[in-house]
Amino acid sequence: YKGTLTVSGKNFEAMKLPFEIEVVNRTLPEPQKWAFHLDLWQNPYAVARYYQVPLWSKEHFDAMRPIMKMLANVGQRAITASIMHKPWAGQTEDHYDSMIFRMKKLDGTWVYDYTVFDKWVEFMMNEVGIKDLISCYTMIPWALSFDYFDQATNRVQFIKAAPGEEAYAEYWGTFLKDFSRHLREKGWFEKTAISMDERPMEAMREAIKVIKAADPEFKITLAGNYHEEIQGDLYYLSIPYGNQFPEEVKAERERKGQISTVYTCCTEAFPNTFTFSEPAEAAWTVLHAVAGGYDGYLRWAVNSWPMDPLRDSRFRTWAAGDTYSIYPGPRSSIRFERLVEGLQDCEKIHILREELAAKGANGKLKKLNAKLSEFTPEGWIKTNKKSPAKMVSEMNALLNEM
């Protein structure tokens, strides 16, 4: 394809720049069919506050639709659902509330209202197109305080209990049994997971006991440090950048159909997607996920906007841009678009690896894997810490060549 780009402006003569583009005769599958498991956590509460619309109203869903569609269009797999009040305390401008109403009746029995949860999940599945996994956070919050409406006192009360305590097991066990029933009635049980993040191993062990006692078929997920003792119980385990699954464990998890990914958060100076990060780091990060043998990538926030996100991307002590990469509007960002570029490259690599292996093109496959190996902590050091922009550009050139 050939064309001309005209550059014009005040006080200078227009310039004509000829250009030529060669389009490779290949197409990618639809994003939801990509092999990469993408998990960027959504915050519906931030959208309601920013647009000043009532929570879960038509106006709220209308405001969320184009934002969430941006995620579906790049292969997002998981729906972020909060099943308790403030699962992460106040680590976002707009705290997450419980999408499930709990009431303790006068006779001591419990009833649950799933109206909001159902609306959110149905919206994300049917209108947005994200439907692989419903991640329900969390049974182990930062503050071990659990809300419910008490009919006897006609007010919201809180139970303070830690994993391993009888009150904790009663509160969660009763709920999970009813939640399992509801999910099965909706046809969502197989897609739903009880999810935790960055919690101590002993607390996780106790929570797992409660989950399995309520329904042994519940899926469980964790974003946190690798613990050999519990990894087998985790359908989906995401570990921090710089950590690796033992090879035999990763192979066994893959055989069982379990998901194993990598995540970055506010901790990693490199690679990341902060406002001040080199934009190519976003692409580098997801290429690293493939290079490291992970199934995908998780990040804890994609639209947890601070007070004035179009003017100031800082939030308290978090690095600027840590809490979002999609802006109100919705507006994309350079770092989000570079992430998309990386995701597309990951799918190209997946396709090429299969094709080259099927053809017995071992030389080309070795060349591709050698270039990809640079996108690991040790591989990057061997390149003398080459700039991410140059590394991603070189990978693009190789993919186009192949």
What are the language-model segments listed below?
Residues K2-G9, M15-A214, A223-Q231, N303-D308, ...:
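Aromatic-lined carbohydrate-binding surfaces of glycoside hydrolases
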Residues K10-F12, K359-G360:
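Short, glycine- and charge-enriched coil/turn segments that flank and shape catalytic ligand pockets
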Residues M70, K119, F123, A283-G292, ...:
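Short, hydrophobic/amphipathic alpha-helical patches that form generic packing surfaces
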Residues C136, C265-C266, C346:
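Generic recognition of cysteine residues
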Residues S145-Y148, V156, K160-Y226, Y294, ...:
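Catalytic domains of carbohydrate-active enzymes that cleave complex glycans
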Residues R184, E202-A223, E228-L237, N243-I259, ...:
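Eukaryote-skewed repeat-based solenoidal scaffolds used as protein-protein interaction platforms
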Residues Y236-W318:
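Catalytic-core region of carbohydrate-active enzymes that cleave or remodel glycosidic bonds
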